[in-house]
């Protein structure tokens, strides 16, 4: 075969057995529905050990795109760090020990920053507990936790429970809670520096709600209609009503989020660059991250450095002398580039990139169409030329709007994707393209929890795989790692030995 291929990733679009909780089922998606009757289709697993995560752990976009591009199961940082905590090898890591040594020798505070939940997408509370235990073993004084509350990869009002759990743990281990800030502010990834500024001011300048009872302050926010994602800085105070710990010049900071995309901006503002328009000034800090957030960052100590994955789909297509396009809006741009390329930032030879800005709204329920129509128009213009041999396209709507927990908006998001998918697929067919319609993980198919509350998290459900091709009529079930071998099979390119998964044709 020598086909041209579009990989269309419907982010957050899973398969559920319970239609009443599904935005997809309740949306009018006549085109995607019609594909199941006309073309070969199967399902893909995107969770747990199928993508290199611990058993039962929901997948996510970073993990999904990495497995899709790699053509193999990529073992993830969550599993790696879980093992290091359990087997106590984390306490032997030089970068961590050096951080504590610096703080002790210079009589400086240690600030532990990160998402405090068991969501397992960006971090895990057990990793923080492991770090606290090592600090206790190393007899480090003045250890402070600045917790970022989740409410997105777990229940929207579970933050109080995690904070109580952490505070109980610190009584036996070491450390004190210094602040709680919602991830909306502390973990932006869309260059909304006005959000990062709010987190920065809480951490550095002591701007926020001051309290001695943090769980009561969280409950007040719940009562006012705010969920964990959106807490503005809550600062725990000392006897003189001053914040227990602000980040000062010369302090040690350890950012324990292992997923890289939502740790970059705050790290940048604290340690790399001044942002005068937001009145944020970088500090001279001993700064450590648990994984490598950005190769361009200077003077960052990294505990676990990832090796780039060799012979990913993009690299193999490039070496075969073929042309490829990566296209997404801002929210998913790193996923179709950096993650899909196995941790490589630079484009391969013959790779072009199309980026459309995500709309500047507070939350995507306010504009569930996002930038899907702009992506569609831009891509179809290229498809008409029929010069690209491979296209990797991401529609972010199902995931990003699914995360809001608002059913009506998620329905609108699904309907938008249906319209855009039709335009792209039909333009592709007209110009000789086979389309693989898949998802990277589930989300918007489960908008309601069993207790009736909104579900904002990913799921462990399988996802669809539809092969839109007039000639090929059968397809096997598989995992995300099987997609790259399937694409190489369609394109008539030899599969490299590093790709250990199989074509599903």
Model-derived features with residue positions:
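Feature captures the catalytic ectodomains and active-site-proximal regions of enzymes
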Residues: 1-505
């Amino acid at each position: 075969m020598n086909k041209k291929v579009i990989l269309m990733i419907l982010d957050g679009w899973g398969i559920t057995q319970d239609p009443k909780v599904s935005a997809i089922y309740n949306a009018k998606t006549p085109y995607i529905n019609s594909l199941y009757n006309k073309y070969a289709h199967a399902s893909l697993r995107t969770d747990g050990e199928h993508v290199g995560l611990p058993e039962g752990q929901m997948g996510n976009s970073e993990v999904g795109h990495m497995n899709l591009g790699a053509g193999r199961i990529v073992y993830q940082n969550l599993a790696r760090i879980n093992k290091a905590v359990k087997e106590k090898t984390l306490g032997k890591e030089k970068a961590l020990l050096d951080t504590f040594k610096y703080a002790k020798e210079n009589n400086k505070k240690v600030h532990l920053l990160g998402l405090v939940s068991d969501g397992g997408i960006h971090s895990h509370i057990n990793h923080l507990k492991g770090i606290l235990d090592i600090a206790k073993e190393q007899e480090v004084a003045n250890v402070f936790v600045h917790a970022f509350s989740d409410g997105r990869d777990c229940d929207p009002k579970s933050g109080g429970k995690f904070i109580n759990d952490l505070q109980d743990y610190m009584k036996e281990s070491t450390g004190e809670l210094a602040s709680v800030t919602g991830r909306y502010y502390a973990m932006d990834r869309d260059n909304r520096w006005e959000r990062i500024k709010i987190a920065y001011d809480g951490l550095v300048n002591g701007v926020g709600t001051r309290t001695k009872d943090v769980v009561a302050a969280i409950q007040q926010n719940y009562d006012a209609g705010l969920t964990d994602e959106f807490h503005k800085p809550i600062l725990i105070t000392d006897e003189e009503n001053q914040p227990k710990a602000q980040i000062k010049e010369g302090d040690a900071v350890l950012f324990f989020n292992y997923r890289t995309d939502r740790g970059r901006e705050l790290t940048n503002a604290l340690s790399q660059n001044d942002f005068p328009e937001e009145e944020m000034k970088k500090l001279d800090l001993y700064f450590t991250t648990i994984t490598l957030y950005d190769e361009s960052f200077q003077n960052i100590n990294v505990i676990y450095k990832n090796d780039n994955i060799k012979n990913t789909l993009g690299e193999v297509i490039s070496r075969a002398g073929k042309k490829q396009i990566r296209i997404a809006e801002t929210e998913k741009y790193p996923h179709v580039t950096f993650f899909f390329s196995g941790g490589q930032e630079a484009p391969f030879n013959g790779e072009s990139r199309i980026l459309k800005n995500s709309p500047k709204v507070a939350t995507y329920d306010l504009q569930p169409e996002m930038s899907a129509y702009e992506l569609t128009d831009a891509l179809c213009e290229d498809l008409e030329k029929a010069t690209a041999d491979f296209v990797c396209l991401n529609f972010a709507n199902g995931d990003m709007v699914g995360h809001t927990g608002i059913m009506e908006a998620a329905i609108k998001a699904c309907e938008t994707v249906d319209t855009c998918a039709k335009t792209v697929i039909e333009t592709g067919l007209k110009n000789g393209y086979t389309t693989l319609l898949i998802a990277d993980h589930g989300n918007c198919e489960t908008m309601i929890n069993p207790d009736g509350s909104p579900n904002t998290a990913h799921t462990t459900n399988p996802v669809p795989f539809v092969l839109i091709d007039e000639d090929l009529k059968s397809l096997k079930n598989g995992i995300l790692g099987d997609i790259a071998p399937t694409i190489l099979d369609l394109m008539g390119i030899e599969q490299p030995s590093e790709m250990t998964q199989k074509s599903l044709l």
